[in-house]
Regions:
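C-terminal motif of bacterial Sec signal peptides marking the signal peptidase cleavage site
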Residues: 19-23
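Positively charged n-region of N-terminal signal peptides that target proteins for export
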Residues: 1-7
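Generic detector of N-terminal low-structure segments
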Residues: 7-9, 311
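Bacterial N-terminal signal peptides
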Residues: 9-18
Length: 323
């Protein structure tokens, strides 16, 4: 009889292991969320971190005693470029990240934030919380050469609307929105094609990877006006908004245009906001657990306090009645 009892006990334990630890009161084996973030020089990260909050006055990036404190979990993968974030999230079923709305494609799933899907309409009406300007920067201390000044005028003109529309960002025509809050409004300029290509050699473009689609469209559009290709007129190296700011500050030849995907207000830099963009929260396309996240849930995930998607899965109330 004792042998029979032992045999039955072994069978029961084997069955428990086969159907998973959850059924026996243990862990289901669900994998941890893979947090994918941008590096600290990214304007996209700055825009995301300064909005995502725990609801009690804490943000992923904030000033504490005059110092900037970053609260993204140390377990996060920190990547330099938008494309790298997209590739990692597309490969990893447990990943979550954030990218420019204009960069979203069908390899990723976009999650609503506070119940709102990012779009041109929800950015303009302010209902989508995580948004930022696309900023064009030049040196305020070094005069621009002829061709760089001409391209800047082109960027400030109505021509930029075509390129913004094509790249998925929201063109700004309102002079007040084109300037920093409280500063002199920046009007839309009129661009006239010159009789010949302005002098000055190649223009250097540095800065935000999120603005790549927009600036490449603008470069190509400008070059065509003078029968040239973009490669003939521009040198482009996009490594993040902070790199763009540094390049503009260090411009000694008047040939640098910087790009930032977060608001800019710094000494030594002239800037204007050419467009608005949403920062979209993305997960793997196969993720059926999460469709919506609140800012507070995002804070929990990106600080590492929430480690499983099941913790933020939307609960549906059962209609079964207890008899």
């Amino acid at each position: 009889m004792k042998k029979v009892f032992t045999f039955l006990l072994i069978c029961a334990l084997s069955l428990c292991g086969a159907i998973g630890l959850t059924a026996c009161g243990g862990n289901s084996g669900e994998k941890d969320i893979s947090v994918v973030a941008r590096d600290q020089g990214s304007g996209t990260r700055e825009a995301f971190d300064r909005v995502v909050t725990d609801g009690n006055g804490n943000f992923l990036e904030m000033k504490v005693d005059g110092k900037t404190v970053y609260k993204t979990t140390s377990k996060a993968s920190l990547l330099k470029e938008t494309g790298n974030v997209m590739s990692m999230v597309a490969r990893d079923k447990n990943a979550i990240g954030y990218i420019s709305l204009g960069s979203v494609n069908d390899t990723l799933k976009v999650v609503t934030v506070n119940g709102v899907m990012p779009s041109a309409a929800t950015v303009l009406d302010g209902t989508y919380a995580i948004q930022r300007p696309f900023v064009i920067m030049t040196s305020s201390k070094t005069a621009l050469n002829e061709i760089t000044a001409d391209f800047l005028l082109y960027l400030k003109s109505e021509a930029s609307k075509t390129h913004a529309d094509a790249s998925g960002c929201i063109y700004l025509s309102n002079p007040e929105q084109r300037a920093n809050a409280g500063e002199t409004p920046i009007e839309v300029e009129t661009y006239t094609v010159k009789s010949s290509l302005p002098s000055g050699g190649k223009i250097t473009i540095n800065g935000s990877t999120s603005m790549e689609k927009f600036i490449k469209a603008a470069m190509s559009g400008y070059a065509k006006l003078y029968g040239k290709t973009a490669d003939e007129l521009f040198y482009i190296d996009l490594q993040g908004s902070s790199v763009g700011k540094t390049a503009v500050k260090n411009d000694k030849n008047g040939n640098v245009i910087g790009l930032s995907s977060a608001a800019v207000k710094q000494d030594g830099i002239n800037s204007f906001n050419v467009a608005l963009d949403a920062v979209a929260v993305v997960v793997n396309k196969s993720n059926t657990t999460v469709n919506n996240l609140t800012l507070e849930q995002l804070y929990g995930i990106f600080t590492g306090k929430i480690t499983k998607f099941s913790e933020v899965a939307e609960k549906t109330e059962s209609s079964d009645e207890t008899l």
